[in-house]
Amino acid sequence: MTVFSGVNKIEFEGTFEGIGKDVVMSQMIRALQKHFPSIRDKNYEFSLFLHIFQRYVLENTSITHDLVCDKIRLPIIDEVVELDDIKNYGLLEGKLLSKLAILKLTGKANPIIGKESPLFEVKNGMSSLDVIVRQTQNLNVRYNSDVPLIFMTSLETESQVSNFLEEHYSSSKVRWKTVVQSSFPQIDKDRLLPIDLQINSHENDFWYPCGTGNLTDTLYFSGELDKLIAQGKEILFVSNVDNLGATGDLNILNFIINEKIEYLVEVVERTANVSNTGVLATYKGKLRSVYYNCLSNESASTCRIVNTNNIWIDLKKLKVLIESNSLNLPIHSSESKITHKNEEIECLQFKTQLVDCIAFFPNSRVLKVSRDRFLPLRTCKDLFLLKSTLYDLDSNGTFNLYPLKFGLLPSIDLGDEFATYETFKIGVPDIPNILELEHLTVMGNVFFGRNITLKGTVIIICDENDVITVPDGSILENVTIWHKSQLEDMNGY
């Protein structure tokens, strides 16, 4: 990519909200050079940001929530391959793993759990990082392989992740490393200029990781892509660090290699516990990711599968696309507010998503996988399920699901009082036994005791001026509770 040195490099037409587009670009370039001189030490980041900003100015690229719902088309179900159909696809050989590398997207702390999210205890004393390293280690030991593990971090997470891994897994059977993705400056929405801070401050409020789509450029410009190819790696398996079911799978790898697939995205059946996650759809003739709440009412009612962000990529094909400047991913722009020098500033952020790369790989596939490959830890209801008796976590980092009485995971609906982990652990200090639970709704000031069992459908809704405490040892089955007196009157709980 070209590092823009002046406005004469760009052709402009029309205006951008009353300001000449050439003026907007020229001002941005001068502001970056003046206020952030050290950005020139990373020419590729300078270029990446200007490339994205230029497209935003010239195209006024659609913001995600401004997509025209009626133009979104869900994929035909026949176009989706089922995991069961590819199991034992040809002869499974452990030596295929010599062609595989695994990468975990670790650029953003979980807003529900907080800055400690990668180190947060999920179950049995293990954090997300413990689980992931042990899963990869188990794969290597089982097949006598050497699958490397890469964590793509950010300015926000790099020191935390690398320090933890160095302390606990410096001598493990997994070759791990971290690669820091690019960060972009927050843009003042009104002035269309970066907030005036020195780049060396790296305050997280003013710098942000620029989305999972940046993985391609980070791998390329860091030299990691060439290193992987030189090591004989052909396929990169990418997933979110908070998806604890995303493991290297020999069946999927075998299918990809035999079919010469260049890009594969895993999807799962949508359930009641999945809210506004990504959905693969066609928009203006191109396959891309949209959020579930962008769908029309008609499409939403027929949407059966959602994106897991488990992605398999052919590394050599990726390099070809990068070097031919072919990956012009859709820009997802969003607005936020930050406080700087006691002044509230409305900001713009520009991100790209890795899943949108699917439109640029000629031989791509969508694979519907089983639910055990999508165990996200994004919300407190996810935490409620994973920490419950429904799941067992073994020493290899594998989650095992107990047989479900109703055939599906229970539907969990928690109110705003349980929105963050800090408030969640106060209201639910001990996860109830939910082996026979079908649905749970909890709203208001509700506090659970210990050794509680929930069965069937349990609804607890507390008035805003009241408090409901579920006593230790309670057994609640097919009940709706509106007032604490109902618990006091119950027999046998």
Swiss-Prot record:
Q: Which GO terms describe its biological process?
A: glycogen metabolic process; UDP-alpha-D-glucose metabolic process
Transferase is among the record's keywords: yes
Enzyme class, UniProt record, top EC level: transferase
Q: Which reaction does it catalyse?
A: alpha-D-glucose 1-phosphate + UTP + H(+) = UDP-alpha-D-glucose + diphosphate
Q: Does the keyword DNA-binding apply?
A: no
Q: Which residues bind UTP?
A: 105-108, 181, 211, 242
Record EC number: 2.7.7.9
Keyword annotations for this protein?
Answer: Nucleotidyltransferase, Transferase
Q: Which InterPro entries match?
A: Nucleotide-diphossugar_trans, UDPGP_fam, UDPGP_trans
GO terms for molecular function, please? UTP:glucose-1-phosphate uridylyltransferase activity
Q: Which GO terms describe its cellular component?
A: cytoplasm
Residues that hold substrate according to the record: 107-108, 240-242
What's this protein's family per the entry?
A: Belongs to the UDPGP type 1 family.
**Function of this protein?**
Plays a central role as a glucosyl donor in cellular metabolic pathways.
- Name of the protein described by the UniProt record: Probable UTP--glucose-1-phosphate uridylyltransferase
The scientific name of the source species is Saccharomyces cerevisiae (strain ATCC 204508 / S288c)
Q: What is the lineage of its organism?
A: Eukaryota, Fungi, Dikarya, Ascomycota, Saccharomycotina
